[in-house]
Each structure stands twice: as structure tokens, then as C-alpha cells.
From Swiss-Prot:
Homology family: Belongs to the bacterial ribosomal protein bL35 family.
Gene name in the database record: rpmI
Organism name: Prochlorococcus marinus (strain SARG / CCMP1375 / SS120)
Keyword Ribosomal protein: yes
Keywords tagged on the record: Ribonucleoprotein, Ribosomal protein
Listed GO MF terms: structural constituent of ribosome
HAMAP family: Ribosomal_bL35
Annotated Gene Ontology cellular component terms: cytosolic large ribosomal subunit
Database matches in PANTHER family: 54S RIBOSOMAL PROTEIN BL35M, LARGE RIBOSOMAL SUBUNIT PROTEIN BL35M
InterPro entries: Ribosomal_bL35, Ribosomal_bL35-like, Ribosomal_bL35_CS, Ribosomal_bL35_sf
Top-level taxon: Bacteria
Pfam families, per database record: Ribosomal_L35p (PF01632)
Biological process annotations from GO: translation
Name of the protein: Large ribosomal subunit protein bL35
Amino acid sequence: MPKLKTRKAAAKRFKVTGTGKFMRRRAFRNHLLDHKSSKLKRHLGTKAVVDERDSENVSLMLPYS
């Protein structure tokens, strides 16, 4: 059986935790930041856990994680 290919776009966007969960970046922090509060921008800088309903799709894209 051939090796499974990793989707490189997904590999750059998601990281796996020690417990097997996937971490992702938050949206809304690329531009148009003037009107957003410092607290919001700081919160958007943290990582978020991928929802368990989406984790299955992410794990299919990253077969060796």
C-alpha cells in the first residue's frame, strides 16, 4: 500500500497537542485593527482548539500527526 500524502496547506495551519487535539489560529487579526480593542487583539493572538466536529477532517488531511 502506498504512503499517504499530507496536505501541506493543512500542515502549515494546524498543530497537534500532546493529547491529540488540533490547534489553530484565530481569524480577524490580519488587517483593519484600528477600531479593535487591545484586549480583543491580544485574545485573537492566542491559539484556539479545533472543534471536535472538524477534527476528523483535519486528521484525514494530516495522516501522520
